[in-house]
Amino acid sequence: MNSENFRLSEKLVSASYVRQGLDARRGHEQLIRRLLDQGKCPEEGWSESTIELFLNELAVMDSNNFLGNCGVGEREGRVASSLVARRHYRLIHGIGRSGDIAAVQPKAAGSSLLNKITNSVVLDVLKLTGVRSVSSCFVVPMATGMSLTLCFLTLRHRRPKARYILWPRIDQKSCFKSMVTAGFEPVVIENVLEGDELRTNLEEVERKIEEFGAENTLCVHSTTSCFAPRVPDRLEELSVLCAKHDIPHIVNNAYGVQPSKCMHLIQQGARVGRIDAFVQSLDKNFVVPVGGAIIAGFDENFIQEISKIYPGRASASPSLDVLITLLTLGANGYKKLLADRKELYGHLAQELSALAARHGERLLKTPHNPISLAMSLNHLEAHSSSAVTQLGSMLFTRQVSGARVVPLGVQQTVSGHTFSGFMSHSEAYPCPYLNAASAIGITKGDVTVCMKRLGKCLKILKKEKSDPADLEAEDGELEESPQRSTELRV
C-alpha cells in the first residue's frame, strides 16, 4: 500500500479510518527508514509485524518474486516446497556472487540489501559490546572453525612462505583442525599454571618466533572464550609481540561477544599492538541456530580480502536469522540478555562453590574467565577411579546438558597430533574437575535444577559397595525441569 492506494481506498471506506491506517503504516515505515538510513541496531525491538513487513518488502525486490519474471538460467530461485519458501521469506537467491560473498546480485536486490544491512547492524552491535574501533565485519554461513580457516587461507596469499601457526593450547578440536585444514602446521604452545588458572606462555611464544623465523610464521592464533581453568589469552601482550615481529594475529572469539571482558581484551589488543581479525559464532552469542559466524577486524581492506576468498554464493539463512533476532531484541533487549548472563554467572559461582564445599571439593579460582567455572573432583576420584567419568554420563542421562567432566590423563589424537591431558588444556593439570558455564540465555531455574541433580549424582557416586541397579533405584525421579520456553523473553 502506497499513498495513492490509500487515497483510492477512501472511495470504499471512511476517509478518517483510512487515514488512521495510513498513520499506522507510516509508523512501520519510519522504523524501516531509520534502519536503512543509519544501519544501526534499533534501541528498542521491533514487533513481528514490522519485521515481516520489512522482509516481505525485500523479497519482492528479488527476481524470483517478480510477477512477470521468466527465468531461463540454471539458478532462478526456484523452490519446490512452499513450506521451504515461507521458511526463508521467499529470499531464495542467497548472498554474494561467485567472486565475492559481499557482492551485490543483479537478480536479487532484496537479498543483497539484506546482506548489507545485516553486516551493518552486526558491526554496530560489536561496537556497543566493547570493540569500538572495529571498522568492518561480515556474516559468513560457516561456524567458527571454518571461518578461521578462511582467515588463514587469506593470509596465505599475503605470506606465501609461511608454514607455521603459533597456537596457545586450547583443547577444542575445531580450532586445531581449522589450521590443519588450511594446510598449515600448528605449533602448540603449552599454557603455564598460575594458581588454578592456565595462562598464556608469552616467553615460549617469543622463543618459537625466533626458532621458526617471523617470515615462516603465518600468524599467532589466540583465544578469548574458553573452558575454565584455562582463561583468555594475554591478548595485549600477544598483540604487542605480533606488531614487534610483523606477524598477523587472528583471534578465536567464539563466544566472547557475551562478556565485556573478552571484547575489552580485543579492543585493547588492537590499540596497543596488532589484531588482524577476530571471529565469533552467531549461535553462541546471538541465540540463533548453528551455522554462522562473524569475521571482523580493524583493517577494512583485509576483511574485504577474506570475503573475496570465499568461493561462490552463500546461504542467507544465518544473516536472516541474526537480523530478525537483533531487530526483535533491539540494542536494549540484547544488552539486557548480556546483563542477565553476567548476573547469573555470579549466582552460578556461588551455588557451585557451596555445593563443592558440601562434598569436600572446591571451586577453582579462575577470576580471568568471565563465562566458565570449574569445580575440583579430587575427593570423588580418590573414592573411585571410575567415578569421575561416570559422573559425566550420569549428568547427561539426567538431562543436564553442557556440564563437562574432565578426568586426568586422557590422550587424544587430533589431525595427527597427540594431546596429553586432553580436555584440560594442559599436559599435567593437578586435578580432575567439572565445568559449568553461564552463557547467554541461561536462567536461574537452569542453575537451581543443575545443582540439585549434580548434588544427587555426587551423593550416589560416593555410596560404597553399591551396584549400578541400586544407584539407579536410589536416584529416583528427575526433579521438575525449569519451566521455560525455547524463546527468550526480554
Curated annotation (Swiss-Prot):
It comes from the Eukaryota. One of its GO terms (cellular component) is cytoplasm. Transmembrane segments: none annotated. TRNA binds at residues 271, 398, 463. It is found in: Cytoplasm. Residues 469-480 have a biased composition (Acidic residues). Its EC number is 2.9.1.2. It catalyses: O-phospho-L-seryl-tRNA(Sec) + selenophosphate + H2O = L-selenocysteinyl-tRNA(Sec) + 2 phosphate. Keywords: Cytoplasm, Protein biosynthesis, Pyridoxal phosphate, RNA-binding, Selenium, Transferase, tRNA-binding. Residues 466-490 are annotated as: Disordered. Homotetramer formed by a catalytic dimer and a non-catalytic dimer serving as a binding platform that orients tRNASec for catalysis. Each tetramer binds the CCA ends of two tRNAs which point to the active sites of the catalytic dimer. Belongs to the SepSecS family. This is O-phosphoseryl-tRNA(Sec) selenium transferase. It comes from Danio rerio. The gene is sepsecs.
